[in-house]
Amino acid sequence: MMQESGSEAKSNGSTIQNGSSGGNHLLECGTLRDTRSNGEAPAVDLGAADLAHVQQQQQQALQVARQLLLQQQQQQQQQQQQQQQQQQQQQQQQQQQQQQQQQQQQQQQVSGLKSPKRNDKQPALQVPVSVAMMTPQVITPQQMQQILQQQVLSPQQLQVLLQQQQALMLQQQQLQEFYKKQQEQLQLQLLQQQHAGKQPKEQQQQQVATQQLAFQQQLLQMQQLQQQHLLSLQRQGLLTIQPGQPALPLQPLAQGMIPTELQQLWKEVTSAHTAEETTGSNHSSLDLTSTCVSSSAPSKTSLIMNPHASTNGQLSVHTPKRESLSHEEHPHSHPLYGHGVCKWPGCEAVCDDFPAFLKHLNSEHALDDRSTAQCRVQMQVVQQLELQLAKDKERLQAMMTHLHVKSTEPKAAPQPLNLVSSVTLSKSASEASPQSLPHTPTTPTAPLTPVTQGPSVITTTSMHTVGPIRRRYSDKYNVPISSADIAQNQEFYKNAEVRPPFTYASLIRQAILESPEKQLTLNEIYNWFTRMFAYFRRNAATWKNAVRHNLSLHKCFVRVENVKGAVWTVDEVEFQKRRPQKISGNPSLIKNMQSGHAYCTPLNAALQASMAENSIPLYTTASMGNPTLGSLASAIREELNGAMEHTNSNESDSSPGRSPMQAVHPIHVKEEPLDPEEAEGPLSLVTTANHSPDFDHDRDYEDEPVNEDME
């Protein structure tokens, strides 16, 4: 029994020793074995407590092991993150080093171009030379076709371009020869200095620097000459700059072309234009680009080529030679540049000098949608003005036909006498064929004498002194206005400083009709003018005075007092009455108009003299070629007025075939200046006569005092 208990104690001790983690368990097992060996009975309670204690210690040991494993994993992750960060830093450092190397290389290149190395050991000295100057670009046939498609050049322009290209190539050859000579001289001087070795290095470097400066100055002069040449080409319309070609002004258009190729190109274009020359010869005065293109259907390319063709509605016909001469005489004159401001419609950009204006013109007004739209609007304005000019010419021709054709029957309602003429009759033309129109404008050469051969121009019966008849330019040539006319070009008038081709009365009526209540105050009318037209945003004192004048002058504008104050409305019936009217009355009031020499000579002379006094270019002394017109200006009026009195005194001496005049009153011819708003229109000679009460409806056009209504 003792042996069995000892074996059990040994087995228990082994299990306890394997499961325990401290030396206390061995001591306890030893004491248990000793007690059992002494013959004591085993205590079951002590064994269960020991087992529970051992299990707790095992669990604690497992938790400690798990914590150690977690700490090791976290340390490994941190090490990996640190390694990744180090790798990223290394990559960033490498990139920075590469960027620094690139910057250093660029700086070396720039410094090499600006200041070449001055090394005595070099066999030859490197001098910076412009690549565009020394190596001309060769234009391929495809580029030639593109140039021909983009720009249709006339034979004259091609000839000028050919001459300028030849001169440019000669300059390039001279520059190359000069460069070679300079390089040889520098090499010889360097060799001499190396062999001699007497001069110090500082003096050698100074000499080389002075030679380089001289050479660079000559290169700059050549580049300036080329730029001036390109600017002249741009002014003449031979060279256009596309938006995507910023480097084009530094090189000529046909640089590098062989003269033979240019001659062949010129021959081809001239052969293509020969057919158009025959058709365009009859319409050369209406050609916008002074080329051989017919005026009936001008192409868009011709309008784009020559920017001087139409500027703000004014046509200018110039040949390339005259244009180049004008640019040489006035290098800073341009139709789109004046007083330091860009005159492009709607631009008004301030440019300090002419090169800045050219830079602004090439950058801001390039060939794009906005510029083409503005060009189309300008073309519409020009077309409207041309139509109006054609109508006025037809009226003038009809008036001249009526005045110079001999009439046998009295006219019931002739046109009002508006003496605006640009054609005069000579003595031979008026006597030989009185019924034919004059073909060439001539000046009267016969001395001015009192009228003795025929009666007066206008004879009246029972005319009473009632008041003067006034025919205003705005009433005679009143341009009708509609909302469609303004809406069509609304954006153009808002942005471009262009005078609208309408009278002030029509504009005031349009402003009132556009209002919701069909009535506006004076300030609201002003605001409408400035809002709709950019032209009225300046010189407010002038046009506001004209608006007030028109409001008080015309009876179609009615002033109404209401809660707001004084408002203006439109009477459509009165407005339609003030449209152009013809003199209606008794046919016996107006006699026949004779076209004899005695009538034509003083009448035309008075007309020319009055036009010369008012500084109209067609009738100035220089253009007429007659220096006596200016000196006889004042005498002609008195002579014309005296002629009427002279014919009145010689009534009894008239021929039997002519009826004597009845109650002749002198007709005084005086000049009536237009209103301030009509200063741009032509001046008219207005006849002031005594008339009957039948003409009372024309008194609406009298000038009334202007009411200064400041509301």
Swiss-Prot record:
SUPFAM superfamilies: Winged helix' DNA-binding domain. Keywords: DNA-binding, Isopeptide bond, Metal-binding, Nucleus, Phosphoprotein, Repressor, Transcription, Transcription regulation, Ubl conjugation, Zinc, Zinc-finger. It comes from the Eukaryota. Residues 320-332 have a biased composition (Basic and acidic residues). Residues 382-403 are annotated as: Leucine-zipper. One of its GO terms (molecular function) is DNA-binding transcription repressor activity, RNA polymerase II-specific. The modification Phosphoserine is found at S115, S692. Forms homodimers and heterodimers with FOXP2 and FOXP4. Dimerization is required for DNA-binding. Self-associates. Interacts with CTBP1. Interacts with NCOR2 and AR. Interacts with FOXP2. Interacts with TBR1. Interacts with AURKA; this interaction facilitates the phosphorylation of FOXP1, which suppresses the expression of FBXL7. Interacts with ZMYM2. This is Forkhead box protein P1. It comes from Rattus norvegicus.
